[in-house]
């Protein structure tokens, strides 16, 4: 399938009209994002998810932290995070509540799948901080 120049320009104009942010905004916001797949030990996914979801309100700089079930893998979880910056994420790993969750959850983790670092630029419910 090829896209004609007119369609491309029309699409760009439509996106601009609805106010979607430009990729250039990424440099200004410097938000830090992570998306990762975590594999729980057999029949431990729900228990691991509960640990990951506990105490989320006490993470300074965390704009979004979503734990999702993988509908195709009964042992997999997807974690999607958005942070004010990479430093806030790094600092969170030293919080007592996060250290406790890591200690409690580690025996329930069988492994890890794909993981990606992203630069969030906005979205529903995600407000750039700068």
What are these regions (language model features)?
Residues 9, 54-64, 82-117:
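An amphipathic, aromatic/His-enriched active-site/gating alpha helix that lines ligand/cofactor pockets
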Residues 1-15:
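N-terminal secretory signal peptides and thylakoid transit peptides that target proteins
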Residues 32-38, 66-94:
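Short, well-ordered beta-strand segments in beta-rich or mixed alpha/beta enzyme
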Residues 37-47:
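Short, surface-exposed ligand-recognition loops at beta-strand->loop->(often short) alpha-helix junctions
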Residues 119-130:
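Acidic/histidine-enriched, glycine/proline-rich intrinsically disordered or flexible terminal extensions
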Residues 20-35:
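C-terminal segment of N-terminal export signals and the immediately downstream linker at the start
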């Amino acid at each position: 399938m090829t896209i004609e120049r007119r369609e491309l320009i029309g699409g760009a104009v439509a996106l601009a009209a609805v106010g979607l942010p430009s990729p250039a905004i990424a440099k200004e916001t410097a938000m830090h994002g992570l998306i990762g797949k975590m594999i729980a030990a057999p029949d431990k996914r729900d228990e691991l998810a509960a640990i990951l979801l506990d105490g989320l309100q006490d993470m300074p700089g965390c704009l979004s932290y979503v734990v999702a079930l993988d509908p195709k893998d009964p042992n997999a979880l997807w974690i999607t995070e958005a942070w004010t910056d990479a430093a806030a994420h790094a600092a969170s790993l030293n919080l007592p509540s996060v250290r406790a969750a890591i200690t409690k959850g580690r025996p329930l983790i069988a492994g890890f799948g794909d993981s990606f670092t992203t630069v969030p630029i906005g979205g529903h419910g995600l407000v750039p901080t700068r």
